[in-house]
Amino acid sequence: MTTALITGANKGLGFETARRLIEAGHAVYVGARDAHRGREAATRLGARFVQLDVTDEDSVKAAAEIVRADAGRLDVLVNNAGIAGARKLGRIGDVTAADMMTTYDTNVFGVVRVTHAFLPLLEAGDAPVVVNVSSGLGSVAATTDPSRVEFRVTALDYNSSKTALVMVTSQYAKAYPAIRFNAVDPGYTATDLNGHQGTQTVEEGAEIIVRMASIGADGPTGGFFDKAGPVAW
């Protein structure tokens, strides 16, 4: 049975991704910072819970040790945990270095913390896959094209963190050719991150995450994908 870990899986896209992977026969670890909500989600899903705060090195290491002791390997890692950031939309000059650090600590450094801690387990896995949840707002091509809706969204910390995440994904893919690393854009999905203002459901948004988490050993690596295919970034 394939073993998967999803960060930020107690709600939204992470929860739906966990549900779909369990439905497909995976053994899933629900990673969540809040122990009560994480356990509740895991119970609802029929998953296993592991407390995991991606901004805390000790928490990440402890989670990796739990999975190592329990499963001995990891086949699928979905780095889904993320924050919207300072929410100073359109007010670039108001964004501080502290705002940037807070957003990057979850959206970029958190992914690196988790990936670093779980790399030995991924290397022991069966055709291992890592899916990093980015955003269309992380596409330089989209955000600089006046004809695209992304062009109108100016969020210095969030957008740039999602751009950085795609590059992080690319670098890991080159360094670890036996592991398929890909970034995905789930689309503008109604979640807590955007106050449920998104134009599509979590079921629709999770589609590309689940698809890329399910690729075989001959699947793509180092790419950025949405439900329509490769994304220019």
Model-derived features: positions:
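Canonical Rossmann dinucleotide-binding motif of NAD(H)/NADP(H)-dependent dehydrogenases/reductases
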Residues: 1-29
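The beta1-alpha1 cofactor-binding region of Rossmann-like NAD(H)/NADP(H)-dependent oxidoreductases
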Residues: 51-65
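Catalytic loop of short-chain dehydrogenase/reductase
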Residues: 83-84, 91-104, 123-174
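Hydrophobic positions on the long internal alpha-helix
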Residues: 78, 114-118, 122, 168-169, ...
